[in-house]
Amino acid sequence: MKSILDIFTRGFIQVQKTVFFATALLFAFSLFTQAEMVDTYQFQNQDDRTRAVELAKSLRCPQCQNQNLVESNSPIAYDLRLEVYKMVDEGKSNQQIIDKMTARFGDFVNYKPPFKWNTALLWLLPVALLILAAVLLYFSNRKKQFSEKVVAQQLENDEIISLPSTFGSSPRKQGEPSKLSKGKVNSKIYFVLFTLLIAIPATYYFSLDRFSRVQQGEQSMIEQHNQNVEMNDEHKNENVIEKLQNKLRTDPNNAETWLQLGEAYVQNNEFDSALVAYSNAEKLSGSKPNILGLAATALYYQAGQQMTQKVEQLLNEALAKDKNEVSSLSLLATIALENRQYQQAGMYLQQLLDSGNAAVDRRSVIQRMKMLDFLQRGEKGQNP
């Protein structure tokens, strides 16, 4: 028996060690993952890096369940985290960055919001109602005890005065309905207090503009995210454009290079030059669906993000030749998103995923679909 117990004890200790090691390993991986999210951004010096990370930790992700911008892996937290890092790199103070974030999302984004009377009222109102309920219950119980004493004294006096009967004294029978009615009254009071305790704070909370502020900030982040997806860094594009131009000088009849040059011009907001490049590609290889879709995108942004007749015509031609044309579906999803047609935008993005086209940036599409889901839940009145 002793040997069996020893074996069991050693086995239990070994299991504990294994669990501890696995926990430590997972914790180490989590730290590494968190550090990796920070290290991908190159700061000018270590002090800026430390300040940026601490500042990002003090800001709440608008989309997550009580996670800061460093802890969260959501797309909006990633974008906000990079925005904080860039503003720190530009030399902006912590207060300037916090003011910009709160102006967009409200005080919800700040883990340490400034004191405001409406916030204090929101937190103190349930406490005040609890205290009020406790006071009312205390006086109600005291009144009940006093009434019971009076009734008991009255019954005692009546028993002394009146003769006992076979069925008991009549005063005791008269006292019972009174107790039942008082019990019903007390139950109603408790129910009313409990209802008020829940209804008043909830009504006041939903009367605040916190959710609408967060939703507006989320919408602005969606628009900014779309622009970041469409437009890359200007200086980087200048180098790409120069390389492509040199390549075309040696081989001007390469349609694929003309397409790449057009995309680089679009990313650099040079839409006129992009349309010239797409036109040259079309002359060399014909009116292919991808060329038409890229040209429609350039025309759309050239017109100030307006759906002109020419843009619509090019989109229809591209999708008639290839219903899963990537640039056309991406543009239609962007237009639907800007018009707050989230369900329609989601359908276009899902079509991109289902197309199986290798040119589709699946990670970017999935991130946009998650944002669409968040916005749809927001329009339905659900808490972000």
Curated annotation (Swiss-Prot):
Family note: Belongs to the CcmH/CycL/Ccl2/NrfF family.
Gene symbol of the encoding locus: nrfF
Signal peptide: 1-35
NrfG: region residues: 180-384
Taxonomy, superkingdom: Bacteria
Organism: Haemophilus influenzae (strain ATCC 51907 / DSM 11121 / KW20 / Rd)
Task performed by this protein: Possible subunit of a heme lyase.
Protein name, entry field: Formate-dependent nitrite reductase complex bifunctional subunit NrfFG
Keyword entries, A-Z: Heme, Iron, Metal-binding, Periplasm, Repeat, Signal, TPR repeat
Pfam families: CcmH, TPR_CcmH_CycH
GO molecular function: metal ion binding
